[in-house]
Amino acid sequence: MKGKFIVIEGIDGCGKTTQIDELSKWLPSSGLIKKGSKLITTREPGGSHLGKRLRGLILDNNQNNKPSPLAELLLYSADRAEHVYKIISPALNNNDWVISDRFSDSTLAYQGYGRNINLEIIKNIESIVCQGESPDLTFFLEISPEESIFRRKNQIPDRIESEGIEFLEKVNKGFKIIAKEKNWTVISASQNIKTISNQIKETVLNNFSKNT
């Protein structure tokens, strides 16, 4: 029996990191994770050793090092292939739980809807890269592009975060389309941290309490 795979998606600034931290603190005492199983939190890009190096290439804010849209897509895909092979699949096959900050649908949103790369090309690449792995539960933390920019105003942005609001609007629209198609759990990220966390916990319990 495989472990459970939870993914949290959303545009930058939506609070994914905070909510993954909240969820990872609660899950071990929730009664959902069987004795002997572990909880692993990870992220994309950068979840593996190779991924950390690729993350530096992907997010480098030096415009002289900016990759083409296709090269960017393939770098993300290389990161994910390694992430699945080295981290996600071994954990799930060991009956461990995995929570990931982003997975393959971020590529559809950012490189597909954001960069206008053909969605079928991305889906074909991802079908190879993901090696059959897909989330058991995906959350979409929804905020407006304007709120995203406001929340990050005092941060030093990486290359993707430096893109203008038009790009962010396209990405956000993509996430909304994907969320509807795949029946994700959509949560307003404009609420306070505790309210969002409680909604995530309730959904996790409802989805997994009968299966553990």
Swiss-Prot record:
Q: What molecular functions are annotated in GO for this chain?
A: ATP binding; dTMP kinase activity
Q: For binding ATP, which residues are annotated in this chain's numbering?
A: 10-17
Q: Does the keyword Nucleus apply?
A: no
The GO annotation for biological process reads: dTDP biosynthetic process; dTTP biosynthetic process; dUDP biosynthetic process
Q: Which catalysed reactions does the entry list for this protein?
A: dTMP + ATP = dTDP + ADP
Q: Which cystines does this chain contain?
A: none
UniProt xrefs under InterPro entries: P-loop_NTPase (IPR027417), Thymidylate_kin-like_dom (IPR039430), Thymidylate_kin_CS (IPR018095), Thymidylate_kinase (IPR018094)
Asked if the record carries the keyword Transferase, the reply is yes
Q: What is the superkingdom listed in this entry's lineage?
A: Bacteria
Look up the EC number in the record and give it. 2.7.4.9
Q: What class of enzyme is it?
A: transferase
Concerning SUPFAM superfamilies, the annotation shows: P-loop containing nucleoside triphosphate hydrolases (SSF52540)
What's a single GO CC term here?
A: cytosol
> What keywords are assigned to this protein?
ATP-binding, Kinase, Nucleotide biosynthesis, Nucleotide-binding, Transferase
Q: Which family, according to UniProt? A: Belongs to the thymidylate kinase family.
User: What does the UniProt record say this protein does?
Assistant: Phosphorylation of dTMP to form dTDP in both de novo and salvage pathways of dTTP synthesis.
Please identify the protein, giving its name as recorded: Thymidylate kinase
- What species is given as this protein's source? Prochlorococcus marinus (strain MIT 9215)
